[in-house]
Each structure stands twice: as C-alpha cells, then as structure tokens.
Regions:
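Non-catalytic ligand/cofactor/substrate-binding and regulatory segments of enzyme domains
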Residues: 1-96, 109-110, 135-188
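Active-site nucleophilic cysteine motif
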Residues: 92-111, 115-118, 122-127
Length: 188
C-alpha cells in the first residue's frame, strides 16, 4: 500500500499537491486507488491509474508498506474510507477543505498506525473532517485547527508546524527538514 502526492494542475499547482491512497491485499489481482475529486461523487475508486500522473505531474510516494503490516492496515483503511463524512455529492470544497488532502489526512487520523504526515503543501490536510477543532494522535501528536484556516501541530510525526490559510511552515525534527509554505519540505 502506498500514499502518493503529486503537484496539482493550473494555478493550484503553484503551491499545492493532490494526494491519494493505493491498496492491494495479498490475494488481490490489481491495486485499488482511492482519492477525492471536486466533480460528481467525491470519493473515487479506481478512476485513475494507481501510480498515474496527476495533471501531467509524476506522483511521489509519501509513505508505503507491504507484507504483514499492509495486511493488518488495509481493513482499517477501508473502514475509514467507508466512514469518511464528506463522501456525498456537493461535500467537496477546494479550500480550506474538505478536499482530496482532507480525505487522506482523515484516513491517517483514523488509522494512526500509519506513521505518516502529508506534505506541507497538501492544502486541506489540516481540515479535520470530523468537524473537530483538535486531534490527539495516540503517538503523541497534537493538532489544533480552526477549520484548516489557522492552527498548530506538534509531535513526533508532525514536528512543529504553524498553519495559516492552509499553508504550513515548520520543522521536522525526526527527519530533519524545514517546511516552507507552498513549496513543501526541504531536507530528508
């Protein structure tokens, strides 16, 4: 299983990525790609090639795992996808969310065993899809947000981040890097 992100199209591509998740169970014959888009039914399953380009931009893996760990996580991920509260027509909002990045971030919050954080330029990742203003990760991360517009995150997964209008600035201490608004992460 892999979480991908790719630079999005048009003006948005100047400062944002689109993220999605790809699953394949042990006995699966093909990969299943799940992402959210702003037209039609928001949650799409296999509408696009699993590792395909997005608006002519190559995807980058954000996190991946295989084997027993993937087998253990896939049912939890599928349950989180089914429970996503913004999966109905008309629920998508480009900014500040809920959008494609809010969807993948929701899965990461519901399945905290996935040791990943979406890139800083995944606009919408800080919109907490449950409507909450905070989230405490079992690993110790704390996320505080006002609908993804203003917030702060701190912890081992996130490092330290400030969020303003969907943009993120901060530092990652575990994988030494600087998070720069609209550009992403520089470092490891």
């Amino acid at each position: 299983m892999t979480i991908f992100a790719a630079v999005t199209g048009g003006f948005k591509g100047a400062f944002a990525v689109h993220s999605w998740i790809v699953l394949k169970d042990r006995d699966g014959k093909a990969y299943d790609r799940y992402d959210v888009v702003g037209w039609g039914a928001p949650i799409r399953r296999n509408a696009y090639v699993p590792d395909g380009y997005w608006y002519s931009n190559p995807p980058q893996p954000v996190w991946e795992t295989t084997g027993a760990e993937a087998e253990r996580l896939i049912p939890k991920i599928e349950a989180a996808i089914a429970a996503y509260p913004h999966g109905k027509r008309g629920a998508y909002r480009l900014w500040p969310g809920p959008n494609s990045n809010s969807f993948v971030a929701y899965i990461l919050r519901k399945v905290p065993e996935i040791d990943a954080v979406l890139p800083p330029n995944a606009i919408g990742r800080d919109y907490i899809a449950d409507g909450a203003f905070y989230h405490f990760d079992p690993a110790g991360d704390v996320n505080l947000t006002l609908y993804g517009l203003l917030g702060v995150s701190a912890g081992l997964k996130s490092g330290f981040e400030l969020h303003l209008l969907g943009l993120v600035a901060g530092v990652d201490f575990r994988r030494p890097a600087v998070k720069v608004p609209a550009f992403g992460q520089f470092g490891s």
